[in-house]
């Protein structure tokens, strides 16, 4: 056996990293639940036919195939396998809605009646890894978690409103101070392209260029678009709208009059106006969102409102979403025809951003208090009671371990462990301390040590940790 | 595209099931952390050489291989692939300890010093899916979660003590009233076999038969052992010890005198005696554990204390563990030579047991209060404020969604949704109610409806839910 290792593009998450990941995931879950989203998990291994033809030619090349040991021997070169690893969480959602969306079960309130197995609308969140056989690189992994919240089965603009509200609440809860949810609408962009006299066939490529406006200066994007065959009049028409400035209401007002000739644009503007009204009525602080007509979002399946969150950290967007009213039909193979709208939090980027912004400063590792242990039976009892009392008070207390029988090296080992794991305090009760009814309390940050009364040691330590 | 479906032996966890799973996992995590265990996650895809030769011939056949799309074309029949899916959580733990166990990093307390990247002992928990290409059947899945807590790097009997203490605490916290942690020791069993005059080469097969004593009557097990070549004297010597009855202390006392001639047995008995003393000193209720000399545990890698938890539910053991002081060396390819002891909770069986025992009765789904919405701007504002206030009070409140513009069907849809999702209350504020400064509160369990003052509606509802 050579050196131990993992596959490129995959990661071991050791405790210090896991504690950060779990903190972010738990914060998001709490907010998802508060807004009425319910958890869903699907298998890592999907049938190939569920994934086939869903991710475009380039995407499909990145799918990992799964082969049982028995089938390895019979697999023919170039043959597709029956099973493959999950590539995203949207296709599994469409499959779940297609399979169970119309299933009826006994009504819990009245067993004689039937009710839908999945509520409609179905509001679910899903936080699971996905796999892509991409070339690994800075911030690009072959195994990474996606973290999605979607509503399937409603066209109400309240859906977009609540997804944006929960996005704002989530980033505030994670400690972000400076972030913006940029909002736009696919119908507005469609109308803009239409009214600028650009052929509808060019819509996707024009949007791809517009989407670069957050990284490139407008002149460069104009040049790129000219290279795609747009003339000066068309470019002027586009940029006149994109360059609109002011409050969200002012930008929409400007677009309303400039795009008066496009029915699609007017529909988009109408929906965004309603969204702004609802966001205000729901009390979402307008400092955290704004209409941005340069937001295009690469993926071509969006049909309505689109949004994307950017922060002060240099990591790119930390979350994005939008309405996609035709995708569930396509992805479920026509088994479910339901409108949908969702948002996705970029877990790895959020972690990188929080690291950059110093938002993990107060996160502690698992250990809080280490009670050293010497193996003397009378003393053991006292140490055990102290640990038990601390744990009952909600403190993460540990007993020091030593080899049997106890040797002086055992104490050095235990203090080394306390240091490696970042404990706040160590408590030492030896035979001497016990005879005096005392314990030695060592603050492992300042390295100062003091004597405290044994009888009230647990209370005193719990109090200091929680102050 | 044919019918939608999943691979046999895998499962979609819809919200009602997920809520139960998350409840159990969150309960276990809280207890792991309290005892100083830290989270670890490793990639689903491992290098083949990490897994090869670790699970025996039969186990290895169940491993799923992973192939990128590009490699499908060049894969030769029968050829092993470079990568495969995780089969358990113990081999990845050994790999992690082998890779990072001796790595040094800057000491957080003093950057000029170096400290170990992983604390020693390393106390980690890991809750992740594993994959096995087994034939699916009742309670046998191809993708299922394992839930392990292990301590690597200490021979202290405090490790076993705390693992059993946390096991008892976990099952109590999950609501189990009637359960037992059965405890035995591999050295005691080894000494028993030795002293009965049975060849050491027969140890594994004899233990396999003894392990069946919880399902088969002693006569059947005797018959099976006789079939394996044991004579009457050997069988009597075995069963004289196994049949010892009484308190844990009495059983150990009996074994101590019957197995006086075996050094291994006396070592095992000495360690179990210390364990009982420590469990009592730590205040673990002795109603929940006992020495059971018929417990053998199938896996042959255990070297010391072994234990297994059984409950009143008919699902088999719900958890098990033990000390395995040589396994990390073997599994890490000799990169780490550390003693270890761990426990594993059987998540699927725990869920089945809790279902059987009715321990999920009080678990609620995501929805608590649905505030119906009619789309009238003035009323909207009131509904939004009500939802916002309820959420701030920690209530899982949702706004009803309806298609725009609102039609009378919208109200029926919203009440249908409330029913499907099991909400406790629906709140209705229409123009009439608003004019009277009232809201209609419908209890969705009793289906009774009453008028409440709008101004204090949020407080009143939050109070009822929390009472």
Curated annotation (Swiss-Prot), chains A, B:
It is found in: Cytoplasm. Its EC number is 6.1.1.21. It is an enzyme of class 6 (ligase). InterPro entries: aa-tRNA-synth_II, aa-tRNA-synth_II/BPL/LPL, Anticodon-bd, Anticodon-bd_dom_sf, His-tRNA-ligase, HisRS-like_core, HisRS/HisZ. Transmembrane segments: none annotated. GO terms for molecular function: ATP binding; histidine-tRNA ligase activity. GO terms for cellular component: cytoplasm. Keywords: Aminoacyl-tRNA synthetase, ATP-binding, Cytoplasm, Ligase, Nucleotide-binding, Protein biosynthesis. One of its GO terms (biological process) is histidyl-tRNA aminoacylation. Pfam families: HGTP_anticodon, tRNA-synt_His. It catalyses: tRNA(His) + L-histidine + ATP = L-histidyl-tRNA(His) + AMP + diphosphate + H(+). Homodimer. NCBIfam families: hisS. Belongs to the class-II aminoacyl-tRNA synthetase family. This is Histidine--tRNA ligase.
């Amino acid at each position: 056996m050579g050196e131990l290792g993992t596959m490129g593009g995959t990661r071991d998450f050791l405790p210090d990293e896991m504690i950060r990941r779990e903190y972010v995931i738990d914060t998001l879950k709490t907010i998802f639940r508060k807004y009425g989203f319910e958890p869903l998990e699907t298998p890592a291994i999907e049938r190939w036919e569920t994934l086939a033809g869903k991710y475009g030619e380039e995407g499909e090349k990145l799918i990992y195939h799964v082969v049982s040991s028995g089938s390895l021997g019979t697999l023919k070169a170039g043959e597709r396998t029956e099973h493959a690893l999950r590539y995203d969480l949207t296709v599994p959602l469409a499959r779940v809605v297609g399979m169970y969306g119309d299933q009826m079960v006994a009504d819990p309130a009245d067993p004689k009646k039937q009710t839908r197995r999945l509520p409609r609308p179905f509001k679910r969140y899903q936080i699971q890894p996905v796999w892509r056989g991409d070339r690994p690189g800075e911030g690009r992994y072959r195994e990474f978690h996606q973290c999605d919240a979607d509503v399937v089965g409603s066209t109400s603009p309240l859906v977009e409103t609540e997804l944006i509200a929960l996005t704002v609440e989530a980033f505030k809860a994670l400690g972000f101070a400076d972030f913006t949810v940029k909002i736009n609408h696919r119908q507005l962009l469609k109308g803009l392209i239409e009214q600028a006299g650009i052929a509808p066939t060019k819509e996707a490529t024009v949007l791809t260029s517009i989407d670069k406006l957050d990284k490139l200066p407008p002149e460069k994007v104009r040049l790129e678009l000219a290279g795609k065959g747009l003339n000066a009049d068309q470019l002027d028409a586009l940029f006149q709208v994109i360059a609109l400035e002011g409050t969200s209401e002012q930008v929409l007002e400007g677009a309303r009059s400039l795009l008066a000739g496009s029915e699609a644009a007017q529909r988009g503007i109408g929906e965004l106006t309603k969204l702004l009204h609802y966001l205000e009525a729901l009390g979402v602080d307008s400092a955290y969102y704004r209409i941005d007509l340069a937001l295009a979002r690469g993926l071509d399946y969006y049909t309505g409102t689109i949004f994307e969150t950017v922060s002060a950290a240099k990591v790119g967007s930390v979350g994005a979403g939008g309405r996609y009213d035709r995708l569930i039909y396509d992805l479920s193979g026509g088994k479910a025809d339901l409108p949908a709208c969702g948002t996705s939090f970029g877990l790895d980027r959020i972690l990188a951003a929080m690291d950059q912004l110093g938002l993990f400063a107060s996160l502690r590792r698992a250990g809080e208090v280490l009670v050293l242990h010497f193996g003397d039976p009378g003393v053991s009892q006292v140490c055990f009671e102290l640990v038990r009392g601390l744990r009952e008070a909600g403190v993460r207390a540990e007993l020091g371990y030593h080899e049997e029988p106890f040797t002086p090296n055992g104490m050095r080992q235990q203090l080394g462990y306390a240091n490696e794991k970042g404990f706040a305090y160590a408590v030492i009760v030896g035979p001497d301390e016990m005879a005096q009814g005392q314990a030695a309390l060592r603050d492992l940050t300042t390295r100062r040590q003091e004597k405290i009364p044994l009888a009230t040691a647990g209370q005193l330590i719990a109090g200091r940790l929680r102050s």
